[in-house]
Amino acid sequence: MAKTIKVTQVRSSIARLPKHKATLRGLGLRRINHTVELIDTPAIRGMINQVSYMVKVEE
């Protein structure tokens, strides 16, 4: 079974770069305190790294 990680949005996407807003949508995050469980892949890790100031990650 693939390893999963939980990603929670902790900061607002208002007044952020459009690229960062798109990254949050790509991760499936819609609002503050919204949590999604994702498969741990290099692509997902790269997306998380890009918006690390807006999300919290639990392994």
Curated annotation (Swiss-Prot):
InterPro entries in UniProt: Ribo_uL30_ferredoxin-like_sf, Ribosomal_uL30_bac-type, Ribosomal_uL30_CS, Ribosomal_uL30_ferredoxin-like
GO molecular-function term, one example from the UniProt record: structural constituent of ribosome
Keywords from the UniProt entry: Ribonucleoprotein, Ribosomal protein
Protein known as: Large ribosomal subunit protein uL30
Family designation: Belongs to the universal ribosomal protein uL30 family.
HAMAP family recorded: Ribosomal_uL30_B
Domain of life per record: Bacteria
Assembly mode: Part of the 50S ribosomal subunit.
Cellular component annotations (GO), alphabetically ordered: cytosolic large ribosomal subunit
Gene Ontology biological process terms, A to Z: translation
CDD domains in the cross-refs: Ribosomal_L30
